[in-house]
């Protein structure tokens, strides 16, 4: 695991640079949802010199070509309180990476980030109008995260200002934060000192909570 201050600085910098290139079009109110990525649907597939998002062979794949870059795709759906699960698999690339889920997104200005790394760390952060905040411990190690080229099941439960982040059925972080109340969801991946991070996402499920 690399120095957490370096990782945090890079996260803020690269999101500001690339945030607009891979957003899906439109935001709609939705209920329970299952996504198996048999087709692109509302997910915007796109590519530039830094990264690509594709939907093929039953997965959404994010390939980050350049070091120090992050890319995402948004679903174009609005949720407030919900439980989300998704299978995320590091296909190739360095373990010093990050990938995960974005929630309560308002375009490129506001969102929560639920992250794991290929070397076994987890974190929750918030981006709000140009300001980054780490919620809870910064890059906490967890033995439940499958390291390297392996699948992990990510689960995010958002209920009011309480967020629970679980990996492979075990809670790794719980935080309180009431700044963002609803918004879109997204999937993302990022590279740090080495390029060519490839992450596949599949079997996304979202269940609204009462």
Regions found by a protein language model. Give the residues of each.
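Flexible glycan-contacting loops in extracellular carbohydrate-active proteins
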Residues: 175-200
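C-terminal motif of bacterial Sec signal peptides marking the signal peptidase cleavage site
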Residues: 22-24
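Secretory/extracellular carbohydrate-interaction modules
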Residues: 64-129
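Extracellular beta-strand elements of beta-rich domains used
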Residues: 37, 202-206
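Short carbohydrate-recognition loop motifs
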Residues: 51-70, 122-123, 188
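Short tryptophan-centered beta-strand motifs in secreted/extracellular beta-sheet-rich domains
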Residues: 37, 84-86, 146-165
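Extracellular carbohydrate-recognition regions
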Residues: 26-47
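Short, aromatic/His-centered strand-loop micro-motif at the edge of beta-sheets
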Residues: 130-153
């Amino acid at each position: 695991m690399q120095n957490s201050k370096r990782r945090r600085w890079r996260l803020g910098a690269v999101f500001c640079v690339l945030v607009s290139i891979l957003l899906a079009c439109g935001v709609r109110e939705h209920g329970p949802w299952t996504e198996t990525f048999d087709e692109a649907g509302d997910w915007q597939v796109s590519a530039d010199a830094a990264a690509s998002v594709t939907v093929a062979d039953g997965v959404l794949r994010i390939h980050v070509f350049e070091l120090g870059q992050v890319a995402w795709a948004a679903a174009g759906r609005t949720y407030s309180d919900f439980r989300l699960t998704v299978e995320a698999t590091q296909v190739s690339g360095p373990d010093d990476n990050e990938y995960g889920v974005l929630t309560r997104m308002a375009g490129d200005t506001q969102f929560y980030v639920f992250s794991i790394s290929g070397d076994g760390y987890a974190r929750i952060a918030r981006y709000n109008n140009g300001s980054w905040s780490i919620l809870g411990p910064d890059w906490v190690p967890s033995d439940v995260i499958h390291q390297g080229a392996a699948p992990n099941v990510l689960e995010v439960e958002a209920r009011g200002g309480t967020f629970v982040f679980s990996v492979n059925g075990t809670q790794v972080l719980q935080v309180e934060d009431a700044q963002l109340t609803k918004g879109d969801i997204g999937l993302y991946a990022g590279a740090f000192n080495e390029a060519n991070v490839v992450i596949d996402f599949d079997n996304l499920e979202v269940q609204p909570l009462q």
